[in-house]
A protein has these predicted regions:
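Conserved lysine of the Walker
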Residues: 14
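Active-site signature of alpha/beta-hydrolase-fold catalytic machinery across serine-
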Residues: 20
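Hydrophobic anchor at the beta1->P-loop junction of P-loop NTPases
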Residues: 6
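Hydrophobic positions on the alpha1 helix immediately C-terminal to the Walker A/P-loop
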Residues: 17
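Conserved substrate/cofactor phosphate-moiety recognition/catalytic segment
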Residues: 23-76
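A glycine- and Lys/Arg-enriched "phosphate-lid" helix/loop adjacent to the NTP-binding pocket
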Residues: 104, 108-171, 175-184, 201
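Glycine-rich phosphate-binding loop used to anchor ATP phosphates in small-molecule kinases
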Residues: 67-130
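The conserved Walker
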Residues: 10
Length: 203
């Protein structure tokens, strides 16, 4: 089993990086005689599948039931983990991980007994899913603000919350040793990701 994931604060280039590495990782998989699956971005998919009929936007959902959304994401990552376990010869490339769910669960917070249950359930699911991730590539902030693309909620523009978000992600490398903190340069990131995956597939 080989599961490689991109993680990091909003607006740090994960989606761009995923697009940039698609072709070289596909070629790399062929070189190693493996198939590769680029898993769908969970944030938008989960919102549209489970919440879009009741909420106009993610921002509306986060104002009403932020941990309900994070719980749905944790459940989706758990499903991904089970899929990876059943297909050990496939290389999985994931946009975000359970680490991201943990960060945003803490960042968004909650109140009341129902949210306490959701938090317990979220971390139970993450415990079951994170152990299948072989390596995390962590994107660092570029020093700017997160791009507003019509999906990211407004609280990402709050400087205090933004600083807290970035601080939380900076500790992932301490908590999970199989982490590579990526450089800022676009080409350098591609080279680091492809090179590291190539070496890990030989292990």
């Amino acid at each position: 089993m080989s599961v490689f994931a991109f993680s990091g604060a909003a607006g740090t280039g994960k989606s761009t990086l995923l697009s940039d590495v698609t072709a070289p990782i596909t070629a790399l998989a062929e070189k190693h005689g493996r198939k590769v699956v680029f898993q769908e971005e969970r944030a938008r998919k989960v919102f549209h599948e489970k919440f879009s009929s009741d909420y106009r936007s993610l921002e509306d959902l986060l104002q009403t039931d932020p941990l309900g959304y994070q719980l749905a994401l944790a459940e989706a990552f758990s499903v991904d983990a089970q899929q990876a376990l059943r297909n050990p010869h496939i290389i999985y490339i994931a946009d975000r991980t359970g680490f991201d769910v943990a960060v945003y669960s803490m960042l968004l917070g909650g109140k009341g007994e129902s949210d306490a249950y959701k938090i317990r359930r979220i971390f139970d699911l993450l415990h079951n899913s994170l152990h299948v991730v072989d390596h995390v590539f962590l994107t660092q902030p570029f020093g700017g603000t997160a791009e507003r693309d019509g999906f990211r909620p407004a609280h990402y523009e709050d400087p205090a919350k933004r600083a807290l978000e970035e601080s939380m992600f900076s500790h992932i490398g301490v908590l999970f040793p199989n982490t590579t903190v990526l450089p800022d340069g676009r080409q350098e990131r591609v080279q680091v990701v492809v090179g590291r995956i190539d070496r890990l597939l030989y292990i």
